[in-house]
Swiss-Prot record:
Modified residues (N-acetylalanine): A2
Residues with PTM Phosphoserine: S217
Name by which UniProt lists this protein: Eukaryotic translation initiation factor 3 subunit K
PTM-bearing positions, type Phosphothreonine: T28
GO cellular component: cytosol; eukaryotic 43S preinitiation complex; eukaryotic 48S preinitiation complex; eukaryotic translation initiation factor 3 complex; nucleus
A GO molecular function held by the record: RNA binding
Name of encoding gene: EIF3K
PANTHER family hit by this protein: EUKARYOTIC TRANSLATION INITIATION FACTOR 3 SUBUNIT 11 (PTHR13022), EUKARYOTIC TRANSLATION INITIATION FACTOR 3 SUBUNIT K (PTHR13022:SF0)
One Pfam family named in its UniProt record: CSN8_PSD8_EIF3K
GO biological process, one term: formation of cytoplasmic translation initiation complex
Length: 218
């Protein structure tokens, strides 16, 4: 993480002003993407700058770097980073391997086909070469979805959704999110009633606002 923090400061300076779109900075930005992948760090602004430079300078396009950017964006679901990055890649490059495979994985995650995602990932594990912490980051997203969707879930189903975890691995994630299991194999996620927090909305309308509306309507 020390290397990432050091590079982050330097990259931050590069991204200011007109220098942001200077193709001479691409090599530095591409190394920064690789550092993010290795150190399980993330900088969306810098990654979008790389994709924008590829748009302006198609001859400099790097498939491997783009793949790393997409995979890092997936680790930040449910935020819309993946969609933002995808929209900056032209259709021809989207059809290339491994970008095509990563876009498919992203589609499976965004549509919550989690079991199919793990199966597809298992068939393309080479995609994760040099990417630290990818699978656990995805599991955090899946746990987020489970937490807002279920009150109870079968133990076997949760294990499948998280990538066929062993019982001991599953217990680690249950402990992390405060989920408990009963003897029947059901996992208690949360009470939806407890998670609903009513909001009191108070809107103040002063006389000046009302009088101006009345005047304009006459």
């Amino acid at each position: 993480m020390a290397m990432f923090e050091q590079m982050r400061a330097n990259v931050g300076k590069l991204l200011k002003g007109i220098d942001r779109y200077n193709p001479e900075n691409l090599a530095t930005l591409e190394r920064y993407v690789e550092t993010q992948a290795k150190e399980n760090a993330y900088d969306l602004e810098a990654n979008l700058a790389v994709l924008k430079l590829y748009q302006f300078n198609p001859a400099f396009f790097q498939t491997t770097v783009t793949a790393q950017i997409l995979l890092k964006a997936l680790t930040n679901l449910p935020h819309t980073d993946f969609t933002l990055c995808k929209c900056m890649i032209d259709q021809a490059h989207q059809e290339e391997r491994p970008i095509r495979q990563i876009l498919y994985l992203g589609d499976l995650l965004e549509t919550c086909h989690f079991q199919a995602f793990w199966q597809a990932l298992d068939e393309n594990m080479d995609l994760l070469e040099g990417i630290t912490g990818f699978e656990d980051s995805v599991r955090k997203f899946i746990c987020h979805v489970v937490g807002i969707t279920y009150q109870h879930i079968d133990r076997w189903l949760l294990a499948e959704m998280l990538g066929d975890l062993t019982d001991s691995q599953l217990k680690v994630w249950m402990s992390k999110y405060g989920w408990s299991a009963d003897e029947s194999g059901q996992i208690f996620i949360c009470s939806q009633e407890e998670s609903i927090k009513p909001k009191n909305i108070v809107e103040k309308i002063d006389f000046d606002s009302v009088s101006s509306i009345m005047a304009s309507s006459q």
